[in-house]
UniProtKB/Swiss-Prot annotation:
Binds 1 copper ion per subunit. GO terms for biological process: cellulose catabolic process. Cu(2+) binds at residues 21, 99, 190. PROSITE patterns: CBM1_2. Residues 1-20 form the signal peptide. This is AA9 family lytic polysaccharide monooxygenase E. Its EC number is 1.14.99.56. It is found in: Secreted. Lignocellulose is the most abundant polymeric composite on Earth and is a recalcitrant but promising renewable substrate for industrial biotechnology applications. Together with cellobiose dehydrogenases (CDHs) an enzymatic system capable of oxidative cellulose cleavage is formed, which increases the efficiency of cellulases and put LPMOs at focus of biofuel research. The lineage of its organism: Eukaryota, Fungi, Dikarya, Ascomycota, Pezizomycotina. O2 binds at residues 179, 188. Its cofactor is Cu(2+). The gene is gh61-5. The keyword Membrane does not apply.
Length: 330
């Protein structure tokens, strides 16, 4: 009886923990909803915990998608996170389970966003991190980027620098959950790369860092006890590029974060491009059929609102995993 009870408790905790995981999966450009058209949505909502792995680039098991979202230099994009694939409702927190931590956004200039593997240099264009809440007794009680994300239905508005050159970029949105970060390897990182094509702009050349390499497991923004009182917090990685922006944690929803509603505003159409059949990020599947695009094994290939490639790489087929919401290559 006791064994059954313990097993049940463990199962319940694991289920609750899994439910608290999340993915960035949709993109808005100047208030227009592009959904997941240009997002390399991870096949799982589980986090990356090894900051030395290639999965730090665009998450585990991700591959290029068939489209790129057009973005004007100096405009705003809004990244959107939710716990479950294709669930864009506001009924649940974007990432629950007291997964408090910063929200960071990077860009990487690439020759072709539909084939880039994330190995090029990255520069940080945005952060919403931490702010002390008066009279708080622990970091859990303070203001965090994740709390802002949860308050704004998973949305975070980000300015694209106006002085960067035109061309293709990977846009990398990231949450670092710090609820178990008091020990090495405990931080949970959730990231998604979006494929975008920037028009306009200038000739600036921001300094860059590499993933992996930009973070260390011992960084004070990675190894930290948020359950104790905090007097400061410094996010890992480089400073925000001068042409980027920051948001003060706890400052409330702004712009598209509060006004953009799924199904009640303008929508955008991303440009279709041929996609290589090989995986772009470490951990992704390989293989592929001939011509056009193909989706790597275990990647999304269909479902409600999905507009990406529907052909699976050689050796796998597109199957409904959670019909009608989600299908993946298996």
């Amino acid at each position: 009886m006791r064994s059954t009870l313990v097993t049940g408790l463990i199962a319940g905790l694991l289920s609750q923990q899994a439910a608290a995981h999340a993915t960035f999966q949709a993109l808005w450009v100047d208030g227009a909803d592009y959904g997941s058209q240009c997002a390399r949505v991870p096949p799982s909502n589980s986090p990356v915990t090894d900051v030395t792995s290639n999965a730090m680039r665009c998450n585990t098991g991700t591959s290029p998608v068939a489209k790129k979202c057009p973005v004007k230099a100096g405009s705003t994009v809004t990244v959107e996170m939710h716990q479950q694939a294709n669930d864009r409702s506001c009924s649940s927190e974007a990432i629950g389970g007291a997964h408090y931590g910063p929200v960071l956004v990077y860009m990487s200039k690439v020759s072709d966003a539909a084939s880039a593997d994330g190995s090029s240099g990255w520069f940080k264009i945005f952060e919403d991190t931490w702010a002390k809440k008066p009279s708080s007794s622990s970091g859990d009680d303070d203001f965090w980027g994740v709390k802002d994300l949860n308050s704004c239905c998973g949305k975070m508005q980000v300015k694209i620098p106006s002085d960067i050159p035109a061309g293709d970029y990977l846009l990398r949105a990231e949450v670092i959950a710090l609820h178990t970060a008091a020990s090495a390897g405990g931080a949970q990182l959730y990231m998604t790369c979006y494929q975008i094509s920037v028009t306009g702009g200038g000739s600036a050349t921001p300094a860059t860092v590499s993933f992996p390499g930009a973070y260390k497991s011992s960084d004070p923004g990675i190894l930290v006890d948020i359950h104790s009182a905090m007097s400061t917090y410094v996010a890992p990685g480089p400073a925000v590029y001068s042409g980027g922006s920051s948001k003060k944690a706890g400052s409330g929803c702004v712009g598209c974060e509060s006004t953009c509603k799924v199904g009640s505003g303008p929508t955008g159409t991303a440009s279709a491009v041929p996609v290589a059949s090989t995986s772009a990020a470490a951990g992704g599947g390989g293989g592929g059929g001939s011509g056009g695009c193909s989706v790597a094994k275990y990647q999304q290939c269909g479902g409600t609102g999905y507009t990406g490639c529907t052909s699976c790489a050689s050796g796998s087929t597109c199957s409904a995993v959670s019909p009608p919401y989600y299908s993946q290559c298996v």
